Amino acid sequence: SLKTLTVPFPACGTPATYSNFGELFGTTPDTEMRKISQDNETGKETNYYLPRNLSVLRILEGCEVIPSKCLMNCFVLKELHLPASLYMMGEKAIYGCAGLKNIYCQAAEPASIHADTFESIRFNVCRLHVPQGSTEKYKQDKHWKPFSLIEE
């Protein structure tokens, strides 16, 4: 079953006309899938079903924005790879992803994020991996500094 997924953009559509990550997998209940709840494009909470063993999401270079609520409640994810091209993450973009144990940031400069982008992340458990020489930039950024485990 699917454990790792590499995508150019973590949603359906384009950055201008996106829906959320769950839309990639659909709303049909399946015992081999894990149910998550995300807001759909109209703002209504919808149940989506992700592969039960999906634990790693890699976002390819070229993605510049992770939209608001895009990965909301994707608690199945254990590892997230963010490209160097990423410069912004929307409100609650990764909200509810409490299962994350590692976030790999390729950008030397911290992406611009909202105060609630990482809400529900366990900052004392999730390791933030950053490029060589950029630890201090992440530690000094008001929204990234809650991560107690920052490694180069």
Segments predicted by a language model, with ranges:
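Solvent-exposed loop and capping/linker segments of extracellular ligand-binding repeat ectodomains
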Residues: 1-152
